[in-house]
Regions:
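Active-site recognition of the HExxH zinc-binding catalytic motif
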Residues: 129-149
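Metalloprotease/metallohydrolase-associated module, dominated by Zn2+-dependent proteases
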Residues: 155-212
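Alpha-helix capping and helix-coil boundary motifs
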Residues: 28, 37-53, 122, 126, ...
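Short pre-active-site segment immediately N-terminal to the catalytic Zn-binding motif
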Residues: 118-133
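Auxiliary, metal-adjacent structural segments of Zn-dependent hydrolase domains
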Residues: 2, 6-114, 185-186
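Long acidic/polar interaction regions in large eukaryotic complex-forming proteins
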Residues: 100-105, 119-121, 138
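Glycine-rich, often proline-containing surface loops adjacent to acidic residues and nearby aromatics
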Residues: 112-117, 158
Length: 212
């Protein structure tokens, strides 16, 4: 599957990673970056510079292993390749904006959508959690693409508040369903069983404890 990345996300991930390494006493990546980036100011016009900087940032994104980490998890889900028109990893505005979706585009084949996963830049600085999170979101995508799952992207409530409550409760049950399958496959989940129980209990506190 062809993967696309939000340039803004790449920039933030790369610079945060270089800063963290520098703070730990390793300035090798930052020094190397400047050897490529500094000459751009002398050799290119202001209009040309953004594209040049994006190319360097993309090269470092790959060199620092971020692209490979994402690609490895997408390869685990090669079965959806023929069902979608590619994947996009975009920058999330907040933790509440993180997640996955299937998105139509004017330049796509009829009936085909792109997988869009939104992430915070900070997720890339914990490689183990990043992979678990991507895998979790791609499990959601598989469900969206499975006819028997019955996923529908439609309004769920009569007003914004009601819709928010319904979505939050439904999402928790869906996450539990995803976790159960990952565990059966011997994969780690983004939240452990106790954490999911606390989430569920908080949202369904009106139910008797024996039902929970």
């Amino acid at each position: 599957m062809k993967l696309e990345f939000d340039p803004g996300l790449i920039e933030e991930v790369v610079f945060k990673a270089m800063k963290l390494k520098e703070e730990s006493g390793d300035s090798a990546f930052l020094d190397e970056y400047h050897t490529f980036a500094d000459p751009i100011y002398e050799n290119h016009t202001p209009d040309e510079r953004p594209a040049k900087f994006r190319k360097i940032e993309w090269d470092f994104f790959r060199k620092m292993g971020f692209y490979k980490a994402i690609e490895e998890i997408f390869l685990e889900f090669s079965g959806i390749d023929g069902l979608v028109a590619g994947g996009v990893v975009a920058k999330a505005r907040s933790q509440f904006d993180e997640g996955s979706n299937l998105v139509k585009g004017p330049d796509l084949e009829p009936g085909k959508k792109k997988v869009v996963i939104k992430l915070l830049a900070e997720r890339f600085h914990d490689n183990v959690f990043l992979k678990k999170l991507i895998r979790h979101e791609l499990m959601h995508v598989v469900d969206m693409l499975t006819a028997s799952f019955g996923y529908k992207d439609e309004r769920l409530g009569l007003n914004p508040m009601e819709e928010s409550i319904i979505k939050e409760r439904y999402s928790t049950i869906w996450d539990i369903y995803v976790d159960s399958r990952l565990i059966s496959q011997g994969k780690e989940t983004v939240i452990d069983k106790e954490g999911r129980y606390l989430e569920f209990a908080a949202l369904y506190h009106g139910f008797p404890s024996d039902v929970n």
